[in-house]
Structures are given as structure tokens and as C-alpha cells.
A protein has these predicted regions:
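Short amphipathic, charge-patterned alpha-helical segments
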Residues: 58-65, 155-158
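Mixed-charge, glycine-accented linear interaction segment located at domain edges/termini
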Residues: 135-174
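Short, positively charged and aromatic/hydrophobic N-terminal segments
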Residues: 2-14
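Beta-strand elements of well-folded, non-transmembrane domains
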Residues: 29-35, 50-53, 125-131, 148-150
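A cross-kingdom feature marking solvent-exposed beta-strand/loop segments within repeated
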Residues: 33-50, 58-59, 67-71, 135-144, ...
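Intrinsic disorder/low-complexity detector
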Residues: 15-27, 70-127, 168-197
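Short, low-complexity cationic-aromatic patches
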Residues: 18-25, 50-56, 112-122, 137, ...
């Protein structure tokens, strides 16, 4: 079923929590760590950080390495930092919160392993705008990210978030490998309070 919307751009501006100059950066780290059986093995993690620059994201990456002792068994680790195209990332109480700050940021994370299905999902949404002058439909797509317990739960969370304020179709939901999300304190508080509402 396709829904019609007269003004997607104003809706997205009101529902996108992106501050000017801030972006989500994906930090991929590879290091030698302890496996569950006690042996040393190559470990890989991915985190998302909401930062003002690549340099700030790099500082967070090094703070994560030091804080989680990822350099405990070897000084040889790899860091890859990529600016993402994520524009909207929702908060959910599925995320646990670290007591302390990491490089001045609030660290939220998933307590369950990805095998359970709990994690971050990118949900592709199609919006249909109706040109009032000629009556033609124009389709645009956006991927909205949300913590969820499954593909179906992610889709439902996006439907609830968008509500009746705009017409849309949820197309697809894909699991994202990010294990944690780091936000400035004010952004975290805003997201947590809007989730509670």
C-alpha cells in the first residue's frame, strides 16, 4: 500500500535529530583479545559515535581502546573510522548505559549477543510526495536506524516513530553490526526523554 504526503522535507527536518556539523562515524576496531574459553584470538567490534569531526571520532576510538583495555595483550590493533550516511538514529530502552563517560560521551550498548537478534537495525522507508500542481507522485527513500529485538520489532518501532504525521511504506529492515552508540550528554538526554514520552 502506498501513502501520499504533501511535504516530506518539513517532516524530516522536525524528526531528524542531526545537529549542524555533527555526523555519525563508524569506528571499526580489530585487536587481540581473550575469547570465552580463555584463549587469545582476533576480535572485531563496531561502534557508532555522534561527533563533530573525524578527529573527535578518532579520540573516542582511542578512549575506547584504553578504557576497555583492548591493547592489553598486544599493541597491534587496527582502527578504521568512516563517516556514515546515517541521518536518523532513534533511542530505545533496549540499550544499556555505561555509568562513566567515554571521551566525554555517553556510551550506550547492547547487553545481548547478536545471535539473539537484539541490536541496531536500519529500516528503509519509502515516502511518496504528491506534487500538488501536476498530481504526479515522487518517491524518496530514507534509512532510519533503531535499536530493536528483531526485524519485525524494528519495523514496528519505525511505524510508531513516524506515526500519522506522514505517509510512508516500510520496505526493509537490516541488522547493523554496531555494538554500541556514543552520544554527547545533551543529545542522549533528548533522545532518552523522547523515547519515554
Amino acid at each position: 500500500m502506498t501513502y501520499l504526503c504533501a511535504d516530506k522535507s518539513s517532516f524530516i527536518q522536525n524528526h531528524t535529530n542531526m545537529d549542524k556539523g555533527f555526523n555519525y562515524y563508524r569506528i571499526k576496531t580489530t585487536w587481540k583479545g581473550e575469547a570465552t574459553d580463555g584463549s587469545l584470538s582476533k576480535r572485531k567490534t563496531e561502534e557508532l559515535v555522534y561527533a563533530s569531526s573525524y578527529t573527535e571520532a578518532e579520540k573516542v576510538a582511542h578512549a575506547l581502546i584504553a578504557g576497555q583495555q583492548r591493547d592489553r595483550f598486544s599493541d597491534n590493533f587496527d582502527i578504521e573510522i568512516v563517516k556514515t550516511k546515517i541521518t536518523t538514529l532513534l533511542y530505545s530502552n533496549i540499550l544499556a548505559k555505561d555509568e562513566g563517560l567515554v571521551a566525554g560521551l555517553v556510551c550506550t550498548y547492547f547487553t545481548e549477543s547478536e545471535e539473539t537478534g537484539v541490536g541496531l537495525y536500519g529500516v528503509k522507508v519509502m515516502f511518496t510526495a504528491l506534487n500538488e500542481k501536476n498530481g504526479e507522485e515522487k518517491h524518496t527513500h530514507e534509512v532510519i536506524y533503531t535499536p530493536a529485538t528483531s526485524n519485525a520489532d524494528a519495523s514496528e518501532r519505525i511505524k510508531k516513530h513516524l506515526g500519522d504525521s506522514i505517509d510512508f511504506v516500510v520496505r526493509d529492515a537490516k541488522f547493523d553490526k554496531a555494538e554500541s552508540i556514543l552520544w554527547p550528554e545533551d543529545v542522549y538526554k533528548q533522545k532518552a526523554s523522547s523515547d519515554a514520552a
